[in-house]
């Protein structure tokens, strides 16, 4: 039955959207804690989930077209249009619940994306301001464990060591 197949596709898509929200929250955690070392991996994982979502979206489109033909709806019907064309029975309610969940995930993901973008822009602005400062001190240490900045204060050495 095509309605079952479409419902299964929608469940897979919901699981992927949930995973995407999790990955975006991971990315946000890395941004807010300054763990930029791991950011490339988190970004790659977000991209991988996005690829899986594209494939799931394509599978959903195929299932919608099959079910739309079965129910007499336009072949390129949206999920909302499919709900309107649904025959008597539980499918209208099931697909309405899927639509509400997908809409909720979309809003949550959009908010996470916007917040992550804000954090990235803030970090970029901070870096640009630091570079414009003209300060050449990097705050790193050389091979001898020294900061590389010359000290103007007198130093006492114990030559007996």
Which stretches of residues belong to each language-model region?
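Short terminal interaction segments
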Residues: 78-161
């Amino acid at each position: 039955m095509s309605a079952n197949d479409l419902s299964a596709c929608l469940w897979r898509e919901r699981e992927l959207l949930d995973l995407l929200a999790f990955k975006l929250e991971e990315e946000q955690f890395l941004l807010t804690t300054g763990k930029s070392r791991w950011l490339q991996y988190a970004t790659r994982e977000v991209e991988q989930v996005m690829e899986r979502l594209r494939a799931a979206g394509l599978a959903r489109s195929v299932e919608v077209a099959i079910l739309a033909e079965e129910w007499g709806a336009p072949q390129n019907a949206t999920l909302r249009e499919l709900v309107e064309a649904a025959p008597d029975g539980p499918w209208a309610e099931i697909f309405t619940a899927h639509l509400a969940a997908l809409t909720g995930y979309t809003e949550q993901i959009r908010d996470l994306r916007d917040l992550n973008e804000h954090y990235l822009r803030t970090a970029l602005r901070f870096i640009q301001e630091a570079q414009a400062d003209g300060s050449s001190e990097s705050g790193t240490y050389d091979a001898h464990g020294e900061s590389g900045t010359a000290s103007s204060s007198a130093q006492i050495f114990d030559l007996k060591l």
